[in-house]
C-alpha cells in the first residue's frame, strides 16, 4: 500500500468492518485482527472473515481502565468458532501461559520479559529468559498432573472473588 493510502485508511473516523472484508478479499493468507477486547467484536471479526484475533488492550496505555485480556478471555473463547484466539498482555511467566490456555487461548504473546532481558543482557539474557519460561511451563504442567498443553482446560481454573 502506498503510505498516503495507509494513512488515510487508519484514520479513526474512516475504519469500519467493511475494511476487514476488503482485506480478506485481497489476502488469501491467514488474517488476524489485533486489539479485540469484547465478545461482540470477536463475533464480528469471525463474521467478516478473520482467521484469528489477538486479545489486547494494548498494554493499557491507550485505555488504562479497559478490561484485561485474561478477564474477558472465557467469554471470547466461547464465541471464537474456528478462529484462533491469541492473548497479548498480562503474560509474564509460565503460569500465565497455562492460565490463558485453560481459559481458552490457542496462543499467547510475551514481550516485556524478553524486552527486559534484552535490555539487561542482550542475546544471552533473552536465551536465559526463554529457558526459564520453558522450565516454568514444564514444572507447572507436572504440578498440574498433565503431560501436554492440550490437556489443559477450564477445569484447572477456580475463580475466587
Where are these predicted regions, by residue range?
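Alpha/beta enzyme core
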Residues: 1-87, 95-116
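Alpha/beta catalytic cores of nucleotide-metabolism and tRNA/nucleoside-modifying enzymes
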Residues: 71-161
